[in-house]
A protein has these predicted regions:
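Glycine-rich, charge-decorated loop segments at or immediately adjacent to ligand/cofactor-binding or catalytic sites
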Residues: 105-115
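ADP-ribose/adenylate-binding Rossmann-like module
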Residues: 71-75, 82-107
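Short beta-strand and adjoining strand-loop segment in the mid-core
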Residues: 39, 70-77, 118-127
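Short amphipathic alpha-helix with an adjacent loop that forms part of the alpha/beta core around
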Residues: 60-68
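Short, ordered loop/turn segments at secondary-structure junctions
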Residues: 43-45, 61, 101-104, 125
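Residue-level detector of alpha-helix initiation sites
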Residues: 21-23, 79-80, 126
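Adenosine-phosphate binding glycine-rich loop
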Residues: 9, 113-151
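Hydrophobic, well-ordered beta-alpha structural blocks that scaffold small-molecule cofactor pockets
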Residues: 1-44, 48-52, 56-59
């Protein structure tokens, strides 16, 4: 895979998260840091999952869920459903991320931290998420130490 590092402007955009498990919750928590409209769709959604979404539908994914969506996080435990979501979303010009399945990803969500307008992001291209998180943490610690770069 060959990923171009970019930052997407999701301000006031619609983001769809399909699934109600741990991966979906992690993406919802990530998205809560941004000003976007989040719809979560899944047959089983926990109260915690619901608190991070603007809109929710406790039901199976439907193709109509893709209408007006900017990006999709396909977090279902059903790989075939994730594959269908990717195929249908891509046909509509929508980018898809499928956690733990880089083959189905159009984009990756790097490990990052922000300090005001500055953001540092680290990605392993989907090959070693734990290492990317460790690098992010080490960089943040380094910048927070004697250099005084991060208060």
């Amino acid at each position: 895979m060959n990923y171009l590092p970019v930052s997407l402007n999701i301000d006031n955009r619609h983001v769809l998260v399909v699934g109600g498990g741990k991966a979906a919750l992690e993406k919802l928590q990530l998205l809560s840091q941004f000003r976007c409209f989040v719809t979560v769709v899944g047959e089983e959604l926990s109260d915690e999952t619901l608190q991070y979404s603007s809109f929710s539908h406790i039901r199976p994914f439907q193709l109509e869920d893709l209408e007006g969506v900017f990006i999709v996080y396909a977090c279902s435990s059903d790989r075939e459903l994730n594959r269908l979501i990717k195929q249908e979303a891509n046909a509509r010009g929508i980018l898809v991320n499928t956690p733990d399945d880089p083959e189905l990803c159009d984009f990756l969500s790097p490990a990052f931290f922000s300090d005001g307008p500055m953001t540092v992001a680290v990605s392993s291209g989907g090959t070693d998420v734990r290492k990317a998180i460790a690098w992010r943490n080490r960089i943040k610690t380094y910048l927070s130490n004697d250099e005084g770069l991060i208060p």
